Amino acid sequence: MSSHDHSLGRPGGHRWKDVPDFIIGITKEIWEDRNLHSLRAYYGPTMAVRSPASIVVGNESVIGATMATLAEFPDRRLLGEDVIWCETAASENGGPGEGTGYLSSHRLICTATHSRPGMYGEPSGRKLRYRILADCASRSGSIYDEWLVRDQGAIVRQIGWDPKAFAADLIAREGGPERCVKPFHPSLDRNVQYTGRGNEHLVGQDHADTLKRMMAGEMSVIKSAYDRAVHLELPGHATEHGRAAADEFWLGLRSSFPDASFEIHHVMGQEDRWFSPRSAVRWSLTGKHSGWGAFGTPTGAEVHVMGISHAEYGPWGLRREYTLYDETAIWKQILLKTG
């Protein structure tokens, strides 16, 4: 038997057969079927969507942001690859109603054509592929908290931008350093309603422990925790293989922010029929850009890195890893410090 009795996970009554069906179903209904008005039912009026680029509060603001994205990418498709989820304790729940609450981590791959002007500049006609990872807290068929990481590095590279150059251009188009939209930082957070951390499943705890050890400088854990042939899907829509690539990625991030505080926020592990054991971890780095690494010359800029990682496990350890952070939001924070 799987670790989830799917008959228990019926958010919003019996329309949805389980939590993955709800998350994938409303995503298609909103974005592809153009039922943007349904956001008023599926998203709470005071809920917050936090992304590395900003924080958006309230379903009306989410509708506006959704319209802007669809106007720029009218043929956008959102293909759900996985939804990792767990029930939440009554004491952790916010949102409406008195039903069972859920935390979910949705991994999807998007396809789109940059065919209209918008946030990404004049239309390039380029075909895009990129991932999103999103953690949502829901109850009674309504999402009341969300943390979303979009692979902006992949989007801007495929359009023809370097992430740093795009961040500089965006600051200018938004009115300069004083007037531009400020990237998300914990000090800007508000309307936090979900207070839990996920579940205690061993797979999730192992994944979180590996991340903690790497961020503490114990890069040697990669040899024991990762499959030698690990498949990696990384920011910039980069695909890599092997332990050396995992070491290069995680060391390049940590060495850029060697003194930053690393924190685990959500951890879930899950085992289901037809799936490998898998996990989802939402994490962050907060501190100074004080080292040489993936983000160039140290600047001393205060930076918050919002990250989400999914992992799948096999007989030889972590065999597939999907990790996202937003390179453009990191560069924007650095450039706001350095000019």
Tell what function each PLM region has.
Residues M1-G339:
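C-terminal and inter-domain tail/linker signature
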